[in-house]
């Protein structure tokens, strides 16, 4: 099974759960490699958002407060930096109690076949691990089955930040 197949399987499994909703860019319309991995997720569970990262994560936290498990998709890790207020000062602090959770799905941009520019391929995984005290940060590489990581994130308490690698989508 390829990396992309693993991610598709994981998203399909999450899409079958009654409490899940998917938010982000290119979740309802094609635009990046992440879109194809949502093929098994019903359209009524997808909410397409503009490029407004702070809004996206704030809305994700709000939906989690209503009991939803929100899969908040950020196609590039570089742009996750735009919502550090929501991530660090709200979600990580656990200020709001509820029965839902936020699973952040973020991708380190692909550098193959050509380099996309410095703002599209940064890997800040280790920095996030040091910064976030209450959000579990996990790398999904070829050695780690994506479906297992997403099941762990869904079944266990707390919020998660799962890091994918664009260069592996075609492997």
Enumerate the language-model features and the residues they cover.
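Thiamine diphosphate
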Residues: 1-170
């Amino acid at each position: 099974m390829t990396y992309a197949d693993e991610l598709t399987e994981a998203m399909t499994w999450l899409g079958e759960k009654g409490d899940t909703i998917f938010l982000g860019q290119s979740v309802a319309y094609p635009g990046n490699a992440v879109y194809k991995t949502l093929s098994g997720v019903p359209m009524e569970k997808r909410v397409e958002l503009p490029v407004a990262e702070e809004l996206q994560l704030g809305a994700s936290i709000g939906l989690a407060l209503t009991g939803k498990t929100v899969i908040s998709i950020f196609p590039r890790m570089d742009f996750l930096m735009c919502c550090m207020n929501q991530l660090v000062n709200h979600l990580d602090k656990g200020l709001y109690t509820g029965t839902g959770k936020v699973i952040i799905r973020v991708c380190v941009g692909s550098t193959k076949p050509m380099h996309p520019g410095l703002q599209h391929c940064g890997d800040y995984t280790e920095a996030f691990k040091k910064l976030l005290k209450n959000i579990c940060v996990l790398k999904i590489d070829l050695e780690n089955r994506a479906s297992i990581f997403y099941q762990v994130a869904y079944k266990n308490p707390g919020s998660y930040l799962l890091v994918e690698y664009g260069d592996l989508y075609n492997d």
